[in-house]
Amino acid sequence: MRFALPFVFGILHLVQMSSASPGVAPEGKGEVSVGEGDRAIQVFIYKPKGFSKGPIFFMFHGAKRNAEDYRNWSIALAEKHHAMVAAPFFDQERFLAHLYSWGGILTKDGKLRDRKGWSFPIATEVIQTILKREGNPKRDHYLIGHSGGAQFLTRYVAIEPVTAKRVVAANAGTYAFPRLDWDWGYGFGKLPSEFQNEGRFKKMLETPMTVYLGMADTLTEGENFDASADANLEGKVRLERGRNFFEYSQKLAKQKGWKFNWTKVEVPNVGHDANLMINDLRIEKALGN
C-alpha cells in the first residue's frame, strides 16, 4: 500500500493534464496541455483580445515552479506587444532541481540519463506545439527565463535547436561556461562527446541572447543560491557571475572569429525579482527592441 499515494497522484496528474483540448487557445487567461503521458506539460496561457499575428512570449519559471505567476507577471508586456504568453510548468515531482534547470542530461553521479527524461527536448516540443496550434510554426517568439529558468535557457541554447527571435536570460544563479575543463552545469565537461565540440559553442554564441541582470542581485546566500566551490569559480554573486559569463563568451567568440549575437542589459536597483525584471522598461532593450 505504500505505493498507493504516488500512483493516485500520477492518475490525477494525467487526468488534469488531459482536461484541456488541443487547438487554438482561448483569449484571456487559460491553461493547455502539451504532450502525452509522463511527458505531458501544463502550460499557463494568456492571449490578448483579438490576438492574431503577434509574437509569443514563452516564460520559464525558476526553482519555485510558479509558472502561473510568470504568466500573470507578463500580461502587461503581452498587452503592450499584442503578444501571447505561454508559461510551461515543470513540476517538482518529475523535474527535481537540476533535472529541470540543467536539462536532466546527467544523473547526480554523472551518468547519462535516458533522453526521454531530458527537460530540454520537452521544452522544444512545448514551443513547437504551441506555435503550430496557433497557426504559424514560424511565428516570431521569444524565450524568457528568470533565475532557474534563465539557467535552463542558457544551457538549452547549446543543446537544442533554437528558432526564437531572442532568448532573454535574467539573473541566472549559475551558467554553463563554454569550456570543457569545468563539469556540466558550470561548463561542458562530462557531457556526451556530441555536446563537447566547438560547433556547440559556436551555435551557443551565435544564438541571439540577452544576459539580463539586476544590479542589486548581490546576495551571497539564500534558499536557492548555489554557494558551492564550482559556482564560486564563476563569481561570488549572481550579478558577477552573469557579467563573467558574458565577458568570457565574448572573448571566446572574438578569439575563434565567430559571430557573437549576445547583448548584456543591466537593471539598476533591482535584485532577484522576476516580476520587477519582466516589468522594467529595460526589458524592451533586452528583447532587442
Locate the predicted segments by residue:
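Bacterial N-terminal signal peptides
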Residues: 4-16
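A domain-start/cap signature at the N-terminus of enzymes
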Residues: 16-56, 66-69, 80-83, 109-111, ...
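The conserved beta1-alpha1 loop
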Residues: 58-62
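Active-site machinery of serine-nucleophile hydrolases
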Residues: 63-126, 246-249, 255, 262
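Short beta-to-alpha linker loops that shape the active-site pocket of alpha/beta-hydrolase fold enzymes
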Residues: 89-93, 173, 270
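Conserved acidic catalytic loop of the alpha/beta-hydrolase fold
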Residues: 122-139
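The feature captures the conserved acid-bearing segment of alpha/beta-hydrolase catalytic domains
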Residues: 166-254
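C-terminal catalytic histidine-bearing segment of alpha/beta-hydrolase fold enzymes
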Residues: 226, 243-289
